[in-house]
Amino acid sequence: MLRDLFVKKKKYAAIPSEQVRKDVPDGVMTKCPKCKKIMYTKELLKNLKVCVNCGYHHPMNAWERLDSILDEGSFREYDKEMVSLNPLEFPGYEEKLESDRKKTELNEAVVTGEGTIDDMLVVVAVMDSRFRMGSMGSVVGEKIARAVEKAYDLQVPFIIFTASGGARMQEGILSLMQMAKTSVALKKHSNAGGLFISVMTHPTTGGVSASFASLGDYNLAEPGALIGFAGRRVIEQTVREKLPEDFQTAEFLLEHGQLDAVVHRDDMRESLRKILEVHQGGEMAVWQS
Protein backbone atom coordinates (compact mmCIF):
# COMPACT_ATOMS: atom_id res chain seq x y z
CA MET A 1 0.00 0.00 0.00
CA LEU A 2 1.05 3.65 -0.57
CA ARG A 3 0.78 4.27 3.16
CA ASP A 4 3.54 1.73 3.85
CA LEU A 5 6.09 3.86 1.99
CA PHE A 6 6.08 6.41 4.83
CA VAL A 7 6.42 3.92 7.68
CA LYS A 8 9.84 4.09 9.33
CA LYS A 9 11.63 0.83 8.71
CA LYS A 10 13.63 -0.93 11.40
CA LYS A 11 17.39 -0.93 10.98
CA TYR A 12 19.18 -4.22 11.20
CA ALA A 13 22.90 -4.80 11.63
CA ALA A 14 24.56 -6.52 8.72
CA ILE A 15 25.98 -9.82 9.89
CA PRO A 16 28.95 -10.97 7.80
CA SER A 17 28.36 -14.30 6.17
CA GLU A 18 30.43 -17.31 7.11
CA GLN A 19 32.15 -17.07 3.74
CA VAL A 20 33.17 -13.42 4.36
CA ARG A 21 34.66 -14.37 7.73
CA LYS A 22 36.59 -17.20 6.12
CA ASP A 23 38.06 -14.78 3.58
CA VAL A 24 40.02 -13.03 6.39
CA PRO A 25 42.96 -15.30 7.32
CA ASP A 26 43.71 -15.93 11.00
CA GLY A 27 46.24 -13.53 12.45
CA VAL A 28 45.63 -10.69 9.99
CA MET A 29 43.62 -8.61 12.48
CA THR A 30 44.07 -8.11 16.24
CA LYS A 31 41.53 -6.72 18.70
CA CYS A 32 42.84 -4.58 21.54
CA PRO A 33 41.53 -5.98 24.86
CA LYS A 34 41.44 -2.49 26.39
CA CYS A 35 39.85 -0.15 23.81
CA LYS A 36 38.39 -2.93 21.59
CA LYS A 37 39.82 -1.35 18.44
CA ILE A 38 40.50 -3.83 15.65
CA MET A 39 43.77 -3.21 13.82
CA TYR A 40 46.03 -4.93 11.35
CA THR A 41 48.39 -7.26 13.18
CA LYS A 42 51.19 -6.06 10.92
CA GLU A 43 50.56 -2.49 12.11
CA LEU A 44 50.58 -3.64 15.74
CA LEU A 45 53.88 -5.48 15.33
CA LYS A 46 55.43 -2.45 13.64
CA ASN A 47 54.46 -0.42 16.72
CA LEU A 48 56.20 -2.88 19.11
CA LYS A 49 52.80 -4.42 19.93
CA VAL A 50 51.52 -1.18 21.48
CA CYS A 51 47.93 -0.25 20.53
CA VAL A 52 47.99 2.77 18.21
CA ASN A 53 44.65 3.93 19.61
CA CYS A 54 44.94 3.66 23.42
CA GLY A 55 48.59 2.78 24.06
CA TYR A 56 47.84 -0.61 25.61
CA HIS A 57 51.00 -2.73 25.78
CA HIS A 58 50.21 -6.16 24.35
CA PRO A 59 52.36 -9.05 25.64
CA MET A 60 55.61 -9.68 23.77
CA ASN A 61 57.23 -13.06 23.44
CA ALA A 62 60.86 -13.52 24.43
CA TRP A 63 62.27 -13.13 20.91
CA GLU A 64 60.25 -9.99 20.18
CA ARG A 65 61.50 -8.49 23.43
CA LEU A 66 65.14 -9.30 22.68
CA ASP A 67 64.84 -7.87 19.17
CA SER A 68 63.41 -4.64 20.59
CA ILE A 69 66.27 -3.89 23.00
CA LEU A 70 69.47 -5.56 21.75
CA ASP A 71 71.74 -4.63 18.86
CA GLU A 72 70.83 -6.67 15.79
CA GLY A 73 72.57 -10.04 15.66
CA SER A 74 74.32 -9.61 19.01
CA PHE A 75 72.36 -12.14 21.09
CA ARG A 76 73.95 -15.44 22.15
CA GLU A 77 71.70 -17.79 24.10
CA TYR A 78 72.64 -19.68 27.29
CA ASP A 79 71.38 -23.08 28.50
CA LYS A 80 68.97 -23.58 25.63
CA GLU A 81 68.66 -27.34 26.15
CA MET A 82 67.61 -27.25 29.82
CA VAL A 83 64.13 -28.74 30.32
CA SER A 84 61.88 -29.37 33.31
CA LEU A 85 61.15 -32.88 34.58
CA ASN A 86 58.33 -34.01 36.85
CA PRO A 87 60.05 -34.73 40.19
CA LEU A 88 56.79 -34.80 42.16
CA GLU A 89 55.02 -36.95 39.54
CA PHE A 90 52.27 -34.34 39.31
CA PRO A 91 49.43 -35.74 37.13
CA GLY A 92 49.35 -34.24 33.63
CA TYR A 93 52.37 -31.97 34.17
CA GLU A 94 54.59 -33.61 31.55
CA GLU A 95 51.82 -33.37 28.95
CA LYS A 96 51.33 -29.66 29.68
CA LEU A 97 55.07 -29.01 29.37
CA GLU A 98 55.21 -30.81 26.04
CA SER A 99 52.17 -28.91 24.79
CA ASP A 100 53.77 -25.57 25.66
CA ARG A 101 57.05 -26.59 24.01
CA LYS A 102 55.23 -27.26 20.76
CA LYS A 103 53.11 -24.11 21.01
CA THR A 104 55.94 -21.69 21.87
CA GLU A 105 58.99 -23.47 20.40
CA LEU A 106 60.67 -22.81 23.76
CA ASN A 107 61.98 -25.36 26.24
CA GLU A 108 61.07 -23.23 29.26
CA ALA A 109 59.46 -19.98 30.39
CA VAL A 110 62.66 -17.92 30.28
CA VAL A 111 65.30 -17.22 27.64
CA THR A 112 68.75 -16.17 28.89
CA GLY A 113 71.89 -15.05 27.13
CA GLU A 114 74.20 -12.16 26.36
CA GLY A 115 74.06 -9.34 23.85
CA THR A 116 74.84 -5.69 23.40
CA ILE A 117 72.92 -2.44 23.73
CA ASP A 118 74.69 0.26 21.74
CA ASP A 119 77.82 -1.95 21.85
CA MET A 120 77.67 -2.28 25.67
CA LEU A 121 77.71 -5.96 26.70
CA VAL A 122 74.94 -7.16 29.03
CA VAL A 123 73.57 -10.48 30.24
CA VAL A 124 69.81 -10.60 29.80
CA ALA A 125 66.91 -12.84 30.84
CA VAL A 126 63.43 -12.55 29.33
CA MET A 127 60.44 -14.42 30.73
CA ASP A 128 57.76 -15.58 28.29
CA SER A 129 54.22 -15.80 29.66
CA ARG A 130 53.11 -18.13 26.84
CA PHE A 131 54.93 -21.00 28.57
CA ARG A 132 53.05 -22.08 31.72
CA MET A 133 52.10 -18.42 32.27
CA GLY A 134 55.77 -17.64 32.85
CA SER A 135 55.66 -19.57 36.11
CA MET A 136 58.92 -20.17 37.96
CA GLY A 137 59.96 -23.81 38.25
CA SER A 138 63.35 -25.31 39.02
CA VAL A 139 64.67 -24.79 35.47
CA VAL A 140 63.50 -21.17 35.28
CA GLY A 141 65.24 -20.43 38.59
CA GLU A 142 68.38 -22.30 37.56
CA LYS A 143 68.63 -20.50 34.21
CA ILE A 144 68.22 -17.10 35.86
CA ALA A 145 70.76 -17.93 38.59
CA ARG A 146 73.26 -19.13 35.98
CA ALA A 147 72.72 -15.96 33.94
CA VAL A 148 73.42 -13.81 37.00
CA GLU A 149 76.58 -15.82 37.71
CA LYS A 150 77.66 -15.31 34.10
CA ALA A 151 77.17 -11.55 34.48
CA TYR A 152 79.30 -11.75 37.63
CA ASP A 153 82.05 -13.65 35.79
CA LEU A 154 82.00 -11.27 32.82
CA GLN A 155 81.71 -8.23 35.11
CA VAL A 156 78.80 -6.84 33.10
CA PRO A 157 75.27 -5.63 34.01
CA PHE A 158 72.36 -8.06 34.30
CA ILE A 159 68.92 -7.13 32.92
CA ILE A 160 65.73 -9.14 33.37
CA PHE A 161 62.25 -8.69 31.88
CA THR A 162 59.69 -10.42 34.09
CA ALA A 163 56.26 -11.74 33.08
CA SER A 164 55.00 -14.42 35.43
CA GLY A 165 52.10 -15.81 37.38
CA GLY A 166 54.50 -16.76 40.19
CA ALA A 167 55.88 -20.05 41.49
CA ARG A 168 54.96 -23.20 39.57
CA MET A 169 52.67 -25.27 41.78
CA GLN A 170 53.45 -28.55 40.01
CA GLU A 171 56.99 -28.41 41.43
CA GLY A 172 56.07 -27.54 45.00
CA ILE A 173 58.96 -26.65 47.31
CA LEU A 174 61.46 -27.04 44.46
CA SER A 175 59.78 -24.05 42.85
CA LEU A 176 59.77 -21.96 46.02
CA MET A 177 63.49 -22.67 46.50
CA GLN A 178 64.20 -20.68 43.35
CA MET A 179 63.19 -17.47 45.14
CA ALA A 180 66.11 -17.89 47.52
CA LYS A 181 68.55 -19.21 44.92
CA THR A 182 68.06 -16.33 42.50
CA SER A 183 68.16 -13.77 45.33
CA VAL A 184 71.45 -15.16 46.65
CA ALA A 185 72.99 -15.04 43.16
CA LEU A 186 71.89 -11.41 42.78
CA LYS A 187 73.30 -10.53 46.21
CA LYS A 188 76.70 -11.89 45.18
CA HIS A 189 76.50 -9.89 41.94
CA SER A 190 75.54 -6.74 43.88
CA ASN A 191 78.28 -7.17 46.50
CA ALA A 192 80.84 -7.21 43.69
CA GLY A 193 79.50 -3.90 42.36
CA GLY A 194 77.40 -5.43 39.60
CA LEU A 195 74.49 -3.51 38.10
CA PHE A 196 71.06 -5.16 38.00
CA ILE A 197 68.11 -3.67 36.10
CA SER A 198 64.68 -5.26 36.59
CA VAL A 199 61.90 -4.48 34.11
CA MET A 200 58.48 -5.71 35.22
CA THR A 201 55.93 -6.34 32.48
CA HIS A 202 52.31 -7.50 32.61
CA PRO A 203 51.82 -9.55 34.74
CA THR A 204 54.54 -9.91 37.39
CA THR A 205 53.02 -11.64 40.40
CA GLY A 206 53.49 -14.19 43.16
CA GLY A 207 56.92 -15.54 44.03
CA VAL A 208 58.58 -13.75 41.12
CA SER A 209 57.45 -10.31 42.33
CA ALA A 210 58.49 -11.29 45.87
CA SER A 211 62.03 -12.25 44.86
CA PHE A 212 64.31 -11.29 41.98
CA ALA A 213 61.86 -8.99 40.17
CA SER A 214 61.94 -6.47 43.02
CA LEU A 215 65.68 -6.54 43.74
CA GLY A 216 66.96 -4.31 40.96
CA ASP A 217 69.27 -1.36 41.42
CA TYR A 218 66.73 0.10 39.01
CA ASN A 219 63.17 -1.25 39.14
CA LEU A 220 61.31 -0.28 35.97
CA ALA A 221 57.92 -1.31 34.58
CA GLU A 222 55.81 -0.97 31.46
CA PRO A 223 52.63 1.15 31.59
CA GLY A 224 49.60 -0.62 33.03
CA ALA A 225 51.52 -3.71 34.14
CA LEU A 226 49.91 -5.74 36.92
CA ILE A 227 52.50 -6.16 39.69
CA GLY A 228 51.84 -7.76 43.07
CA PHE A 229 52.04 -10.83 45.26
CA ALA A 230 48.54 -12.01 46.20
CA GLY A 231 45.47 -11.40 44.06
CA ARG A 232 43.22 -8.39 44.53
CA ARG A 233 40.22 -10.39 45.78
CA VAL A 234 42.33 -12.31 48.31
CA ILE A 235 43.69 -9.06 49.75
CA GLU A 236 40.25 -7.42 49.90
CA GLN A 237 38.81 -10.43 51.73
CA THR A 238 41.73 -10.41 54.17
CA VAL A 239 41.79 -6.70 55.03
CA ARG A 240 38.01 -6.31 54.53
CA GLU A 241 38.47 -3.09 52.61
CA LYS A 242 37.82 -1.98 49.05
CA LEU A 243 41.12 -1.37 47.29
CA PRO A 244 41.77 1.53 44.86
CA GLU A 245 40.87 0.87 41.23
CA ASP A 246 44.50 1.25 40.14
CA PHE A 247 45.84 -0.97 42.93
CA GLN A 248 48.78 -3.20 41.85
CA THR A 249 49.31 -1.30 38.60
CA ALA A 250 52.73 0.00 37.61
CA GLU A 251 51.49 3.57 38.05
CA PHE A 252 50.23 2.85 41.58
CA LEU A 253 53.57 1.32 42.56
CA LEU A 254 55.48 4.27 41.10
CA GLU A 255 53.32 6.72 43.08
CA HIS A 256 54.04 4.78 46.29
CA GLY A 257 57.79 4.53 45.78
CA GLN A 258 58.10 0.88 44.76
CA LEU A 259 59.32 1.64 41.23
CA ASP A 260 61.92 4.01 39.88
CA ALA A 261 60.14 4.65 36.58
CA VAL A 262 57.32 3.53 34.30
CA VAL A 263 58.81 3.36 30.82
CA HIS A 264 56.85 3.22 27.55
CA ARG A 265 57.98 0.39 25.29
CA ASP A 266 59.05 2.86 22.60
CA ASP A 267 61.50 4.37 25.09
CA MET A 268 62.75 1.16 26.74
CA ARG A 269 65.92 0.59 24.72
CA GLU A 270 66.98 4.24 25.04
CA SER A 271 66.26 4.23 28.79
CA LEU A 272 68.38 1.12 29.27
CA ARG A 273 71.14 2.62 27.14
CA LYS A 274 71.21 5.75 29.29
CA ILE A 275 71.37 3.76 32.53
CA LEU A 276 74.19 1.59 31.20
CA GLU A 277 76.05 4.65 29.96
CA VAL A 278 75.81 6.34 33.37
CA HIS A 279 77.42 3.33 35.02
CA GLN A 280 80.18 2.83 32.48
CA GLY A 281 83.41 3.36 34.45
CA GLY A 282 81.47 4.57 37.49
CA GLU A 283 81.35 3.24 41.04
CA MET A 284 79.12 0.29 40.10
CA ALA A 285 81.69 -0.83 37.56
CA VAL A 286 84.49 -1.11 40.17
CA TRP A 287 84.49 -4.84 40.78
CA GLN A 288 85.76 -6.41 43.97
CA SER A 289 87.28 -9.86 44.36
Swiss-Prot record:
Single GO MF annotation: ATP binding
Xref: Gene3D superfamilies: 2-enoyl-CoA Hydratase, Chain A, domain 1 (3.90.226.10)
Cellular compartments annotated: Cytoplasm
Subunit structure: Acetyl-CoA carboxylase is a heterohexamer composed of biotin carboxyl carrier protein (AccB), biotin carboxylase (AccC) and two subunits each of ACCase subunit alpha (AccA) and ACCase subunit beta (AccD).
Binding sites annotated in the UniProt record for Zn(2+): 32, 35, 51, 54
Protein name listed in UniProt: Acetyl-coenzyme A carboxylase carboxyl transferase subunit beta
Source species of the chain: Bacillus cereus (strain ATCC 10987 / NRS 248)
Family: Belongs to the AccD/PCCB family.
Classification lineage: Bacteria, Bacillati, Bacillota, Bacilli, Bacillales
